[in-house]
Every structure is written in structure tokens, then in C-alpha cells.
Design a protein with these regions (language model features):
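Bacterial N-terminal signal peptides that target proteins for export
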Residues: 1-12
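Bacterial N-terminal signal peptides
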Residues: 11-22
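N-terminal capping segment at the start of a domain
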Residues: 28-63, 88, 274, 347, ...
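Extracytoplasmic/secreted proteins, especially bacterial periplasmic and envelope-associated proteins
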Residues: 30, 39-42, 46, 63-78, ...
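Noncatalytic luminal/extracellular "stalk/propeptide" segments of secretory-pathway proteins
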Residues: 45, 49-163
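Metal-dependent peptidase/peptidase-like ectodomains
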Residues: 113, 262-264, 277, 304, ...
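Soluble metallo-hydrolase cores and metallopeptidase-like ectodomains found primarily
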Residues: 119-151, 208-282, 294-297, 301, ...
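His/Asp/Glu-rich mid-to-C-terminal helical/loop segments that flank catalytic regions of hydrolases
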Residues: 420-477
């Protein structure tokens, strides 16, 4: 935790909490862009146009990402910012041929899995193995309940025989943990079935944070159930799993722009600019990039903020938070310790949205707490509901995790991913209960039509207002 933060307390609390309690005019209530400023959705459309012209995605290491970084850098330079491009390399894997999953002829119901029902995970190992199938703590009787822990603990693999293929269920822990536990038990392959709750039944895109030594596939809930039944049958089930991937290293870059010097305390505001290879990534995460970019452009037209701000657009988040990890790891120790707060924007235009404000409780400081209150106050003044989440881990991670791991206080603004909105949230935020916040998460349909311009505008306005009211850093820093 940054050692200077206690010295900020008096000015900080007064400045931010005064903002949180400010009165709102009736003309502002419920509007997306209340100050007559430009619409952040224009940046979403520009990034969609880039994806369309570059193979349908903006994945790190592709021309779509490079053109996206050029667009953001050009916008910032046009507003007067000095832009820094932070180059780094990242490991990648690409399929050389389609994956395959076949239930062997010795099983009770032989079949070959249709191509549309399976995918290889990013950073899967290559391999073509035929071996007995073993289900691991699937808990299918509780399939309507979120929170499967299948494969999350090494104890789940008690009785697992080396040389078998593990069938696990998507759930609460990272894919990496499931695969590492399976490898430790001697598995020669892993099949991850979708969880089976609303919004998590189809085949899904996933990534491993480090490359696996064995092939790893994802399959639909329906296909997983068929495999589970075969694994439990009287006749031993044998499956063939094939993944053929090319691995290597590619280069990409972060886009960084500072407003004010960073010789003292400063705030970092960021969102990832890359998409998954499967689609253009408009909600995930052109929306967050658009909010950060629009806030930077608006503030460039105003007097300097009291607290210096670094605006960051991360590359290779979808490959394992690599851009933000590179940035944090490359900072001199003194500069890293002077980061007073990191604010992350990831997926802030979900069509069936909620307005989530996340904070990691153990890293919470006066500045983080006051900023959360300022954001909640902004929305409260406009009769716009929010939901605060503490201990936020976003399951499989966003770039705030890179900063939190380095002891930096973090806040995340988020409107929901593939999980289902519950009835209480539908009552508070509108939308449809038991349906995903984002039905196109990590899919080709994550286009501009998958972004709600209203909530994107609301998030952008709130972010801009909080940034312009940040207190000055303590003197002598």
C-alpha cells in the first residue's frame, strides 16, 4: 500500500465527499450525457469499423488491434496529449487444424462431437490422445445453481488414475486452476463443460494464463452431459481428444497518456483495448476504452485536474492481463508506489446491464472509499441505481488484478458479463431477470448492437466528473 496515502486524508475526504453530496438539477436526472458533451459511442463505432476492415476482430497481435491503438493514439494527440506506446511481447497459440473430440467405439453411445460444440482453450497444449474418461466432481444435480467448484481443489482428483482424461465443469475458479490440478493428478487431457446455468450453456472461449502441457477443450453443457453419462456407464468410456496448435511470441503495445506530471501521487485510469479473436469486442471492451478515451478528451479541454492522471489502454488483456502486468512490472518502484488509485473500466455497455462498482476491500484506502462514494453519489443524484461489490475478483480477472497484486488500491466499473441478472437486480436496474447481462460475451455477435449507448454515456459522465474533482496530492510529493 502506498505510504503517502494517510497524508492525503483531510483534503481528500472533504473534496470527494463534498462532490458526492452535491445537488443535481432536475434537468440532469436520468440523462446519459448531461453536460452537452460528445458521445462516447462514436469511439465504439470507430472501433467496430476497424474490426470490420481487419478480419472481424481486434485481438492483440493483429492488424485490427494495431489500427485500434493507432485510433486511440491519434485521438489523444489531437487533444494535445503526449502519447507513449509501450511495446511488449506475449505468448500466443493458434489452431493449425480444428480440434476433435470422439467418444470411442467401446463406449455405450459412440459419437464425434460437432465442431460447433467444442473449442480449444487459448494456451492449450497440443496433443492427440485416446484414454479413459473420468468425470471430476461435476455436481450436475445442482446444475441450475451457479458456483461449481469442479476441479478447483486437488482433492477433487482423489481416485483419478494417471493417464486418464478429466471432464470438469466451468465454475468459480480459473480454468488455470482446474488444468493445473488435472495435470498434477496425471491427466493427459482436460475437457471443460459449460456450467449449465442461464447464459452458460453454449461452447465458450477461454484462456489459460500459462501454457498447458496437455490438450484442453471446452464443450457445451449438452455435450458435457453426454460425456458424463458415458463416464458413469457400466462400459468404460474412452475418448479421443485432439488439439493442434502453433505457439510462439508476438509483439503488441499499450497506449499511455499522462495529464499532469507523475512526480507525486497520481491516479491511473484504464481499460483493455483488445478483443478476443472470435469477435470485434464492442462491449468487451471497446465500451471501456471509449469511456476512458472520452473522459481524457473532455478533460483536455478544461483546466488541469488537481491530481495528475494517467490514461491507459491495455493490450493483450484477453491473453492473460499481459499489457497491464507489463506496465506495472516495468515501473520503477518509486513510481509504482505513488499510484494513489487505479480505476478499471471493462464492459460498461452491457445490453442487460447493472451498474456495478467494485473495490478490493483489503486494498481499500481513503481515496478508494471516497471515490466509490463519489461515484455512488453521482448516480444517486440522478436516480440511477448502483450495486457495490467488495472483495471484487471478477472471477478470471481484469486489469485491476494486475494493480491489486502490486498493492495498488483499485476500483472497477462494470455492467455485467455472461452471468445471469437475478430478479432483485432486474427490479433495481430494469432489464430481464434470468438472462445474461451480456448475451454476446466473447462471441462474434459482440458488435455495436450489443452495446447500450445510454449506460455507456452514464458511466462516462460519472467517470469524467469524479476525475475532474480529484483532490490535489499532498505537498512535497
Amino acid at each position: 500500500m502506498s505510504p503517502f496515502l494517510p497524508g492525503i486524508r483531510p483534503a481528500l475526504t472533504a473534496a470527494l465527499l463534498a462532490f458526492a453530496g452535491a445537488a443535481a438539477s432536475q434537468a440532469e436526472v436520468g440523462l446519459a450525457s448531461t453536460r452537452g458533451v460528445t458521445d462516447p459511442f462514436r469511439h465504439v463505432q470507430a472501433l467496430q469499423d476497424i474490426a470490420t476492415a481487419n478480419g472481424g476482430n481486434r485481438a492483440a497481435g493483429t492488424s485490427g488491434y494495431d489500427r485500434s491503438a493507432d485510433y486511440v493514439a491519434d485521438q489523444l494527440r489531437g487533444a494535445g496529449y503526449q502519447v507513449r506506446l509501450e511495446e511488449f511481447t506475449f505468448p500466443y497459440s493458434e489452431e493449425r487444424s480444428p480440434p476433435a473430440l470422439v467418444l470411442g467405439p467401446a463406449g455405450p453411445d459412440p459419437f464425434a462431437t460437432p465442431r460447433e460444440a467444442l473449442r480449444s482453450l487459448s494456451n492449450s497444449g497440443s496433443g492427440d490422445v485416446t484414454a479413459p474418461l473420468r468425470s471430476v466432481d461435476l455436481g450436475l444435480a445442482e446444475s441450475l445453481q451457479p458456483g461449481s467448484t469442479s476441479g478447483c481443489e486437488r482433492e477433487d482428483f482423489t481416485g483419478f488414475a494417471a493417464g486418464e482424461i478429466a471432464l470438469v465443469r466451468r465454475g468459480t475458479c480459473p480454468f488455470q486452476a482446474k488444468v493445473e490440478n488435472a495435470q498434477a493428478a496425471g491427466a493427459v487431457g482436460v475437457i471443460i463443460m459449460n456450467q449449465g446455468i442461464e447464459g452458460q450453456t453454449d461452447v465458450f472461449t477461454g484462456r489459460l494464463s500459462t501454457p498447458a502441457a496437455i490438450p484442453v477443450l471446452s464443450v457445451t453443457t449438452e455435450m458435457g452431459r453426454r460425456l458424463a453419462a458415458a463416464a458413469q456407464s457400466a462400459t468404460p468410456a474412452t475418448v479421443r481428444v485432439k488439439v493442434d496448435v502453433e505457439t510462439g511470441a508476438r509483439s503488441t503495445r499499450n497506449v499511455i497518456a499522462d495529464r499532469g506530471g507523475t512526480g507525486g501521487a497520481y491516479v491511473v485510469v484504464g481499460g483493455h483495448l483488445d478483443s478476443v479473436p472470435e469477435g470485434p469486442g464492442m462491449n468487451d471492451n471497446a465500451s471501456g476504452s471509449a469511456a476512458v478515451l472520452e473522459a481524457a478528451l473532455r478533460l483536455a479541454r478544461e483546466p488541469a485536474t488537481a491530481m495528475p492522471i494517467r490514461f491507459a489502454f491495455w493490450g493483450a488483456e484477453e491473453r492473460g492481463l499481459i499489457g497491464s502486468r507489463h506496465h506495472v512490472g516495468a515501473l520503477p518502484e518509486d513510481e509504482r508506489r505513488r499510484i494513489a488509485l487505479y480505476i478499471n473500466l471493462d464492459m460498461v455497455g452491457s445490453p442487460n446491464f447493472a451498474r456495478f462498482i467494485h473495490v478490493i476491500e483489503e486494498n481499500k484506502t481513503d481515496l478508494a472509499a471516497a471515490t466509490v462514494q463519489a461515484l455512488k453519489g453521482y448516480f444517486d443524484e440522478r436516480s440511477l441505481a448502483t450495486e457495490e461489490r467488495t472483495g471484487y475478483r471478477r472471477g478470471f480477472g481484469s486489469d485491476d488484478a494486475s494493480f491489486a497484486a502490486a498493492g495498488v488500491p483499485t476500483i472497477g466499473l462494470f455492467t455485467g458479463a455472461s452471468g445471469a441478472k437475478n430478479a432483485a437486480q432486474a427490479e433495481r436496474f430494469g432489464g430481464t431477470a434470468e438472462k445474461p447481462f451480456d448475451p454476446c460475451y466473447h462471441q462474434a455477435c459482440d458488435t455495436t448492437g450489443n452495446v447500450d449507448p445510454l449506460v455507456l454515456g452514464q458511466i462516462t459522465d460519472a467517470l469524467t466528473e469524479v476525475l475532474r474533482r480529484l483532490p490535489p496530492p499532498p505537498s512535497g510529493r
